[in-house]
């Protein structure tokens, strides 16, 4: 038995060790975008709060069902002793004998009709639960989108730093060549000085890019609630997809995306749920003018004796309880006549609430329609910009390679070489920015078409 426990302990230690190695390896190679999303969802305080709200909604639905279809049952007991002149519980006459009574009772009641309030409450609780689930999904989507944007910022400035670093190395080599050409009399001191200034300017841009990368990383860590001891490392191996103009959706496909979003988007479903609940509340308020019908009943019994009364022998406890059983059943009908106009005021308020909810639902539909159309337009616009940025980068690379050869041969000045370097840097940076924007906008369109952000990766 002891050996078996020892083996189990060894297996557990091995399992924990392997898990730690796997986690360490994952952190070492950097977290992917999906890893960052999953981590942010796991640590999000906002999501934990919403999950608790959904659990409250489930409890409210259960309570509404039980309140509508089950009675309320109570049981109780009490005991008392009477002194002096009081009513004799055995003969129902007055005497000066001290008595002791112990009573028991069980009662229950159920509302048979209260203007369909119980039924409407069940429907309201069901809709509220649906709204809570949709709100939870909306929070998840917002966290994933914010994480994606922050992740793209880190990727952009990380790769921009790499691009600028490459230009710095190129300018260092150009400066070395310019000094050598100065020694050979092929270039003047002004060209060398200009190359040194260009190198210093590029090194300054590198520092700016690195600082922005550090700031973007802090923002991503804060968004993810990063709690690890080591600094967050992300996987920069992003998709280098090229854009093709034939990827544009047709008008029919755009209409399908819009229709799907209007029918399934959490924001619209939540607004519709609020409108439906407001309508049910209005119905309940109208039925408040109807009578209420309730049914109740109960069973009671008691035991009594005369302590200190000489020669009195009380009946056995069980026999007394059986003999003294009393039962009742009550059917109650209540008509509302005057309640200080509270029912009328409540009805007006519920009407106003329904008007507001209906207007908010219409607003949500218009906003979503505008967001979807803008998302499709942004995706197509950034796609066209990416297509042009890729062509521009290719041309600038050819020009850059040609200018490097000219600079080595002393055919262009340091100023022309600097301009070519800046043009290439801008082309690469704008192509990288266009690619990340296009990927982000494309993900938003996919989201509106029913694919959650985290499932896209």
Model-identified regions with their sequence ranges:
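Periplasmic alpha-helical coiled-coil/stalk elements that build and connect Gram-negative outer-membrane
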Residues: 2-4, 142-260, 378, 382, ...
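Sec/SRP-type N-terminal targeting helices
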Residues: 48-52, 65-66, 98, 112-140, ...
């Amino acid at each position: 038995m002891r050996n078996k426990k020892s083996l189990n302990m060894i297996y557990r230690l091995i399992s924990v060790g392997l898990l730690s190695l796997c986690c360490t390896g994952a952190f070492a190679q950097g977290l992917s975008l999906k890893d960052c999303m999953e981590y942010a969802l796991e640590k999000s305080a906002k999501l934990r709060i919403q999950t608790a709200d959904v659990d409250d909604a489930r409890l409210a639905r259960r309570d509404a069902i039980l309140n509508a279809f089950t009675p309320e049952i109570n049981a109780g007991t009490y005991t008392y002793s009477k002194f002096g002149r009081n009513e004799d519980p055995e003969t129902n006459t007055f005497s000066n004998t001290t008595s002791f009574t112990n009573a028991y009772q069980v009662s229950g009641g159920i509302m048979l009709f209260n203007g369909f309030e119980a039924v409407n409450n069940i429907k309201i609780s069901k809709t509220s639960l649906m709204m809570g689930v949709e709100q939870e999904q909306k929070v998840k989507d917002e966290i994933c989108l914010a994480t994606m944007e922050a992740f793209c910022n880190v990727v952009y400035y990380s790769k921009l730093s790499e691009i600028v670093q490459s230009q710095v190395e190129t300018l260092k080599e150009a400066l070395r060549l310019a000094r050598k050409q100065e020694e050979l009399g092929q270039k003047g001191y002004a060209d060398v000085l200009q190359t040194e200034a260009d190198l210093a300017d590029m090194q300054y841009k590198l520092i700016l890019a690195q600082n922005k990368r550090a700031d973007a990383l802090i923002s991503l860590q804060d968004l993810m609630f990063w709690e690890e001891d080591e600094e967050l490392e992300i996987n920069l191996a992003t998709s280098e997809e090229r854009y093709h103009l034939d990827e544009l959706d047709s008008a029919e496909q755009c209409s399908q995306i819009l229709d799907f979003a209007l029918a399934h988007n959490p924001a619209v479903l939540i607004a519709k749920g609020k409108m439906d609940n407001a309508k049910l509340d209005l119905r309940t308020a109208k039925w408040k003018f109807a009578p209420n019908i309730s049914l109740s009943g109960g069973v009671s019994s008691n035991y009594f004796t005369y302590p200190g009364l000489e020669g009195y022998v009380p009946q056995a406890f069980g026999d007394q309880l059986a003999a003294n059983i009393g039962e009742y059943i009550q059917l109650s009908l209540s008509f509302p006549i005057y309640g200080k106009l509270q029912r009328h005021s409540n009805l007006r308020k519920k009407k106003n609430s329904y008007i507001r909810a209906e207007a908010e639902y219409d607003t949500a539909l218009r906003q979503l329609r505008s967001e979807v159309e803008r998302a499709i337009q942004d995706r197509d616009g950034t796609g066209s910009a990416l297509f042009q940025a890729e062509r521009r980068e290719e041309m600038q690379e050819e020009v850059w390679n040609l200018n490097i050869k000219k600079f080595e041969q002393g055919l262009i000045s340091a100023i022309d070489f600097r301009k070519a370097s800046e043009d290439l840097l801008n082309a690469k940076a704008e192509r990288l920015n266009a690619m990340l924007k296009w990927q982000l906008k494309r993900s938003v369109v996919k989201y509106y078409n029913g694919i959650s952000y985290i499932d896209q990766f």
